[in-house]
């Protein structure tokens, strides 16, 4: 892939930042996509489409270094949940407004959405929707949902 648009954007960050200036990038890593969102298990095709557009963290580090950034490090706030308390509402899956809180749903086909809604309604009817959410949310505690990458533009030497 080569990530040409990412490289172009990072070059622009380097161009406009003063020497010694800081850059903070928040992103969701491919692993976080797979492990950090309980409902992504229901929409694997959409998740794969989204992952195609997400740069892995090692490649991001390499691009930052290539563009003159240094002191590259990252933080993963494991306690941060992007949708807040509503993320833990398993019935939100059935609510279009809840789904509008995550852009991944725009990648879900109408047919797949219909299947997901039927599955959600069946789990709800059997009283298993909450346990489904809890079971598939366990891995989030280890991966988090978002990564903050910090880098500093190198200071020009005379």
Predicted regions and their residues:
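Glycine/small-residue-rich loop that forms an oxyanion/phosphate-binding "nest" at active or ligand-binding sites
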Residues: 1-2
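Residues that cap or flank secondary-structure elements
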Residues: 5, 51-53, 81
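A short glycine-rich, Lys/Arg-flanked "PGG" loop and its adjoining helix->strand segment in the class I
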Residues: 5-22
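A structural signal for short, well-ordered beta-strand segments and their strand-loop junctions
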Residues: 24-25, 71-75
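Short alpha-helix
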Residues: 52-68
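Conserved Class I S-adenosyl-L-methionine
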Residues: 73-158
